[in-house]
Design a protein with these regions (language model features):
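Bacterial Sec-dependent signal peptides at the C-terminal "C-region" and cleavage site
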Residues: 7-18
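C-terminal cap of metal-dependent C-N hydrolases
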Residues: 389-429
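Divalent-metal coordination cores built from histidine and acidic residues
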Residues: 68-69, 73-76, 90-217, 250-297
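His/Asp/Glu-enriched, well-ordered alpha-helical/loop segment
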Residues: 212, 299-306, 311-398
């Protein structure tokens, strides 16, 4: 049975008498040599560390002879809603992959503000097992990286000036994010024309607001000049490697003065054409990941483009120089980007560090205490010491001496509670998607009854469009309870703009519309329109959709569910797995299309 179906059984109960881990090689996360010791856990904290600790009544004893106890690993750069090999999102499997690799803290850059509350609700309740999530809200500049995928300003909030940054941060902080991600650097690696970048005053305005709220700022920074901008603005970390030029003394001095750390995400830049996998590493991958890599390894090697070879050499040298210069360096991977797999990539990143000038102990410290410090949480977690949070894992062997032993995870603890790893492994090996909480639909979707801009379902309507900097733009307002949409089409050959009405907050959890016959609404407009159903476990390009027409006057449109079609002939419409309804406006490049909508509802 999938771990998610078991709820809190995937996270063991708090032991009333505590947990005593005996005779482990304890790597405390600081980089100091591991030593034999016992560790006593009480509640969610480490109570004591030492030799010969006494076992009080009711304590659970774990014999850790031959094993190493470590603080949980961090991944400071993930996209948990992306699986790393294409396909629909499966948060439960992404979370599971991190836990089985000993990653107890993951920073997620793949969410929008509306997603934070429902994700926290289902993970903190135990409905879906997860590491300690640090959910980030994204900011960027118009025409910059992060804004070109067609996901809308709600997903990457745009801030071209310090004043706009203040407004964007007002919106962002209302969602209580754990971190702020800023797409500050527009270099696209020389493959395509550069995008726009953020200036120092705007970035500094974001940093000041975030730090006042106790929140770290991590930037998408990939160039030497962009790194100087970020360090001058006082960001907590550069969230990628500098790949265009060798770092200079000026940057090192700026980073040391501002306390800006370096999270180079070497795993995403490592040329994949000739990369190899250790047997233990390959064994721990999910079946589709393993199949992809085995198929690649069975083929003749593809050539590595000269651009990638040159960038990789620069990244390696910059990692060495920044380490030698005394800059703090943490672990992040960009997990979820093609071929950078959830969970396993964090261990691979640690291994890569040991190939480029780090000892095993230094690389492990980067993944534990240093990364916790980058998140401004070093006083609370990231080390094995009395008073620290008990996010820990046990590994067979001595990874502080032989880094490959890091794949031999035996036990994982989150806040002092042991994680059941076997159900998580079964979940990863299953073809099924993780069960998520579902909400029964009552009928109304957006009838105009609310006056706060939200739908009847208390969700926020948002605009999306085709990818590209020259994309379409949708503006919508409410007039007399109706939604009025006006789209200015972009320069793409087949431009479109869409209004997304989430059926649950952030379209994360599921909507159950079983028992209804279809969707009805009132519409007026003379353009080309379609209604699509965003569904769990289906790729966006394959969402079920039905075309519809409008007219010069408002009229009711009813679309039965059996009229919706998918581009994937194998796809099946599951009315218990809906997430959003999407009204799509299509037109000619540079044209304008409008649509008026009202009384949107499921009908029986």
């Amino acid at each position: 049975m999938a771990c998610a179906l078991l709820g809190l059984l995937c996270l063991g109960a708090v032991q009333p008498g505590g947990i005593l881990i005996r005779s482990a090689h304890v790597f405390d996360g600081t980089g100091a040599p591991a030593g034999l010791a016992d560790v006593l856990i009480s509640g969610d904290r480490i109570e004591a560390v030492g030799r010969g600790l006494r076992a009080r009544r009711g304590v659970r004893i774990i014999d850790a002879r031959g094993m190493t106890l470590m603080p949980g690993l961090h991944d400071l750069h993930t996209h948990l809603r992306s699986p790393g090999l294409g396909g629909p999102d499966d948060l439960g499997k992404a979370y599971a992959a991190h836990l089985i690799h000993g990653v107890t803290t993951a920073v997620d850059f793949s969410v929008s503000g509306e997603m934070l509350a429902p994700i926290r609700e289902m993970t903190e309740s135990g409905a879906v097992s997860a590491p300690r999530l640090q959910l980030a809200i994204r900011l960027g500049v118009p025409g910059g990286h992060g804004t070109e995928r067609g996901w809308g300003d709600f997903f990457t909030m745009e801030a071209p000036t310090p004043a706009a940054a203040e407004l964007a941060m007002n919106r962002a902080l209302a969602y209580r994010p754990d971190a702020i991600k800023v797409f500050a650097d527009g270099w696209r690696y020389g493959r395509v024309p550069d995008l726009n970048s953020m200036n120092v005053p705007t970035l500094r305005a974001i940093v000041v607001r975030a730090h006042a709220a106790g929140i770290p700022v991590i930037t998408h920074t990939v160039t030497l000049e962009g790194a100087k901008v970020a360090a001058s603005a006082g960001v907590d970390a550069l969230g990628h490697g500098i790949g265009d030029a060798i770092v200079d003394d000026e940057l090192i001095a700026l980073m040391r003065a501002s306390g800006t750390a370096y999270v180079p995400t070497m795993a995403v830049y490592e040329p994949q054409q000739d990369r190899s996998f250790l047997p233990a590493e390959l064994r721990l991958l999910a079946p589709p990941e393993r199949a992809r890599e085995e198929a690649r390894l069975a083929r003749p090697l593809d050539p590595i483009p000269e651009l990638e070879t040159r960038r990789w050499a620069i990244l390696i040298e910059n990692l060495r120089r920044l380490k030698a210069g005394g800059v703090r360096i943490g672990i992040g991977t960009d997990a979820g980007i093609g071929g950078v797999y959830q969970g396993s990539s964090a261990v691979r990143e640690v291994r890569l560090f040991t190939q480029f000038g780090f000892t095993s102990a230094q690389a492990l410290a980067a993944a534990t205490s240093v990364s916790a410090g980058i998140l401004r949480q070093g006083a609370d977690r990231g080390r094995i010491a009395a008073g620290q949070r008990a996010d820990l894992f046990l590994v067979a062997g001595r990874p502080d001496r032989r880094i490959e032993d890091l794949y031999e995870v035996r036990r994982v603890f989150l806040a002092g509670r042991e994680v059941a790893l076997a159900p998580l492994r079964r979940l990863l090996d299953s073809d099924e998607f993780t069960p998520l909480p579902a909400h029964r639909m009552a009928g109304p979707i957006d009838t105009g009854a609310r006056t706060d801009g939200r739908t009847d379902l208390d969700t926020l309507p948002v605009a999306t469009n085709e990818a590209g900097i020259d994309h379409s733009r949708l503006h919508f307002t409410r007039e007399g309870g109706r939604l009025v949409l006006v789209a200015r089409m972009g320069a793409a050959a087949r431009p479109f703009a869409s209004l997304v009405l989430p059926l649950t907050r952030g379209a994360v959890q599921l909507a159950d519309a079983r028992g209804f016959a279809g969707i009805a609404f009132e519409a007026r407009g003379t353009g080309r329109y379609a209604l699509a159903l965003e569904s769990y476990a289906i790729n966006a390009r394959d969402f079920f959709r039905a075309d519809f027409g409008g007219g010069t006057t408002m009229r009711e449109v009813r679309i039965p569910f059996d009229q919706f079609r998918s581009a994937d002939p194998a796809a099946r419409l599951d009315l218990a797995r809906l997430r959003a309804v999407i009204f799509r406006l299509e037109g000619e490049p540079g044209g304008q299309v409008s649509l008026e909508l009202g009384n949107i509802r499921f009908y029986r």
